Amino acid sequence: MEQPQAECPAPSKTNSAETVESEKHEALSGPEKHPQDKDGADAAPEKHPQDKDGADAHGEAGKQKSGDQTLPPVQDGGNLECPPPEASSSPPGPACGIPSEVETTEACSRPQQLPQSPRIQQPDLDFYCVKWIPWKGERTPIITQSSNGPCPLLAIMNILFLQWKVKLPPQKEVITSDELLTHLGNCLLSIKPQEKSEGLQLNFQQNVGDAMTVLPKLATGLDVNVRFTGVSDFEYTPECSVFDLLGVPLYHGWLVDPQSPEAVSAVGKLSYNQLVEKIIICKHSSDSNLVTEGLIAEQFLETTAAQLTYHGLCELTATAKEDELSVFFRNNHFSTMTKHKSHLYLLVTDQGFLQEEQVVWESLHNVDGDSCFCDSDFHLSHSLGKSHGAEGGSGSPEKQLQVDQDYLIALSLQQQQQPQGMLGLSDLELAQQLQQEEYQQQQAVQPVRTRAPSSPGRGATSGRPAGERRQRSKTESDCVLL
C-alpha cells in the first residue's frame, strides 16, 4: 500500500491519475493479479478504466465525474489520506505529493482554507478578563478586551455592571461571551412594561422579541446608521430596541456644523448610507448644481473622517445628563461613556490596563484623540508616569493637588467663556480660543512648577510608557498635563 504513492509523480496528468486509481483498485480487489509492485503500476492505466464503476467507460469522462465527487470527503486539512475506491476513484490529492497537478492543487487548497473561517477563530475572542474597580464605594467589575471583539456587548454590559444591575462572584477573573449574553438576556426578560394598556403591552412584547432576536449580534457587531442632525439620531433598526428596552442612551458626535450652510444643505437629514448613495448619484449627474452638492457632501465626509466634530462634541456635552451612563458610537466602535462635572469620559476597557487600578476613565474633550487618564473618582492618573519617570514619591500628593487645581481653573475658564464665544464664533474657533486661554494659564503657573524639582525631574514627562496617550502639543489640548 506504500508503493503506489512513490509512483505518483508521473510525466502527465492523465497517467498520474489513472495510475493511482488502478493501483488502489488492484490493492483492494485483486492483489493476486499483480505480484510485481512497480512494473504493474506502469501497465495499469490501459487495463482498468473500464471496470472501475461501469459509469466511466470512456476514460477521461468517467475520471472527470469521479473527480467532482472526491472533493466533499477531503475535509481533514493537514492529515489527508487517499479515499477508498467506493468513496472515490480520483487522484488522492495532497497525500500523493504532486504540486504541479491542477486537480491536486484544488483538492489541497480547499481544506486548507477551512481553519481560516471566523467561526473557528471565534473561540480565541470568547474569553474576557474582569477588572475590579472601586466605584462609588463598592467593588465593581468591568469587562476588558484584548482586541477588536464584541464591543457593543461589552459597552452595554459594563453599564449594567456599573449600575449594579448585574453582579459577578467576588473572585471572578475571566468571563465568556455566552455568560455575558445570558446575563443580558435575563435583564431583558425581567423588564416589565410601565404602561398597562393592551396596545402598549403588545408593542413592548414585540420589542422584547426583536431584542432577543438580535441579541447574538451583540457578540459580533451591530449595524447602526447615524444621521448627522443630532447626537441621538440614528436610523431605526431592530438593533436599537436593545438600547431602548434597557434605557441606555446611544450617542454619536458626527454632526454637520450649522454655521456651514453649504454642508448643511448638502447633507440635510440623510443618514450615512443615504449620503453615500447621494454622492455617487450627484457625481455622475449632468446637472452642475448636483455635482457641486455631491462634492460638498464628499468633502464633509473626508474632513470629518474621525466621526467626531467640534459641534458634535459641544452638542454631546450639552445633551448627556450629569452622571448618566451611555454608549458612545464612533469609528465603528462602541464605548461606555459618562458625564462628570460637565465633562465627558470614556471607560477604559483595554486589557493592557488590566493591572492599572488608577486608569479607569479617559477624557473626551477634543476631536484629535488627545486625552487624559483618570481613576474611578475622575482624578487625573499619574501612576503610569511614577513607575517609569523621575517623579519622586515625596511630592506626589502636592503635585496631584496642584495639577487638579490647574485643571479645574481651566475648566472654569471654559465654562465662563463658552456663552460669550458661541455668539459669534464657530465651534472650531471657539475650541481654539479656549485652548489658547488654557495655554496662557498653564504658562502662568509653569515657572513655579519647573523650579521646584531638580534637573533629573525633567524626565517625569518623558518617562511615560508608549501605551499611554499623550498630548501632541500643549496648544492642541484643553487638558493640562505636567
From Swiss-Prot:
Region spans: Ubiquitin-binding domain (UBD): 402-441
This protein's record includes keyword Hydrolase: yes
Pro residues biased stretches: 82-94
EC numbers on record: 3.4.19.12
GO cellular component, one term: nuclear body
Active site: C151, H333
Keywords per UniProt: Hydrolase, Phosphoprotein, Protease, Thiol protease, Ubl conjugation pathway
Post-translational modification Phosphoserine, affected residues: S117, S454
Region (Disordered): 1-119, 437-482
Top EC category: hydrolase
Keyword Protease: yes
Biased composition (Polar residues): 106-119
InterPro entries: MINDY, MINDY_domain
MF term (GO), any: K48-linked polyubiquitin modification-dependent protein binding
Basic and acidic residues composition bias: residue spans: 21-66, 466-482
Reaction(s) this enzyme catalyzes, per UniProt: Thiol-dependent hydrolysis of ester, thioester, amide, peptide and isopeptide bonds formed by the C-terminal Gly of ubiquitin (a 76-residue protein attached to proteins as an intracellular targeting signal)
BP terms from Gene Ontology: proteolysis
Residues under site feature: Ubiquitin-binding: D427, L430, A431, L434
Biased composition (Low complexity): 437-446
Family: Belongs to the MINDY deubiquitinase family. FAM63 subfamily.
The protein's role, per its UniProt record: Hydrolase that can specifically remove 'Lys-48'-linked conjugated ubiquitin from proteins. Has exodeubiquitinase activity and has a preference for long polyubiquitin chains. May play a regulatory role at the level of protein turnover.
Protein name, UniProt field: Ubiquitin carboxyl-terminal hydrolase MINDY-1
Gene (name only): Mindy1
